[in-house]
């Protein structure tokens, strides 16, 4: 299988604190007229959002502007949250089929849809959008399986693949899959600043009304939106860009805004009480892993790595790192994202077993390890000392260093022999397939390390991952079974510490209805719900 694993590290540094604090609002609709003290009168929703805008180009977009993009643009399909009655919600494609071998995917394109610039959407517009994504998207690698794409008539798009792949999941990606007006694509091809002028060319429920860089984004309901059942809830969404979580909390509790996407986790309960609201939790795609440097003794011995895995106080890490809003990981695949399975074994906190394994491996007196974590990640700063203290109880001294993520990442890639012994990583898949992403990116063998910073190489694991990747589009249950076997190998060989999956945490103000958070779009705030609020 030809898999590209050069995944961009979007937000690995700058956006991480926001992602840890409070998840974006998954969807909202107005509460009863006059309910509470929220200012949602006259069809205006005010929001304090942590999301910055790195680009308004929907093709190049690969960062926190996803919060806005999902309201302006649409993909072929939306991937629904775990537990939904249907796996997908049709968007630009009203239906789709795949051949038995998973090599041909046919999408029936919705008629009567217009782009915000007045152009009509048809199959050719879809083809041009995906070809642009293949060529220059920030997440262009998601289209690696695509060999060719064609419009066989005005309403039919056919994709031909190099190997069986889950194009439904790819087509529902939050990055690299937006359908864009051909007129705007042509204009941006000759002017790379075209979109930065405040132009938008989507089909979504909102248009970009105005943008004050670093300060404010105003979205306006699109009058000709095709989906009458999911028409924009608000006429205007007025968003203040507020990177500081404490400031956002103050704006919310002072009723300067109706909703805040970022509130410090330690204050969640107090904020909910002040707002007469509720705290809601859900799956998120955010997963914490601790790489072992498997090239250097004593971590080249699986028994040593297993011992250290038993010496991690997992629940304490969750309680201290994310205020209890998390669950112990079943490997590096986050809960709710394919191919997550609770059949994958977990290590328990067992210091006696850890000591016995170390002694059996010839290290009864312990040793010293160097651990690094991202200095810009507040959760890591809170939970890493717990790892140090626990390892000390089995005679392992840990020297901890906080570094900017990109600095430690570059060092680990360029000089494995002298890199850290343990590297704490915060990771999430680009789209809703953590088999082709997490399991590949984090632990698949490679000649030159990019993101497999354990440097672990295992031909049997690689074969399972590669095989599963070619089955996901044609036989997902078979792919799942192979991925579970591969994750069992990760447990047994322990090239990393599988710490925890962070949860999405939302404060729901009393005057707003909030649909369930969608872990497939963690950086996107939908102001018109994909599914009705419960």
Language-model features, listed with the residues they occupy:
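Aromatic- and charge-enriched surface segment that lines or borders ligand/interaction sites
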Residues: 94-137, 152, 158-163, 298
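Ligand-site clamp/hinge motif
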Residues: 223-270
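Gly/Pro-rich hinge or "lid" segments in bacterial periplasmic/extracellular proteins
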Residues: 81-83, 174-229
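Detector for C-terminal structural segments
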Residues: 212-216, 312-338, 379-386, 413-534
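Append "and occasionally in soluble cytosolic enzymes with long acidic Gly/Pro-rich linkers
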Residues: 300-389, 394, 457, 532-533
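Surface-exposed binding/hinge segments that line
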Residues: 108, 141-186, 210-212
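A bilobed periplasmic-binding-protein/Venus flytrap-type ligand-binding module shared by bacterial periplasmic
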Residues: 79-80, 220-224, 284-307, 311, ...
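N-terminal lobe/hinge region of extracytoplasmic solute-binding protein
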Residues: 48-100, 131, 201-202
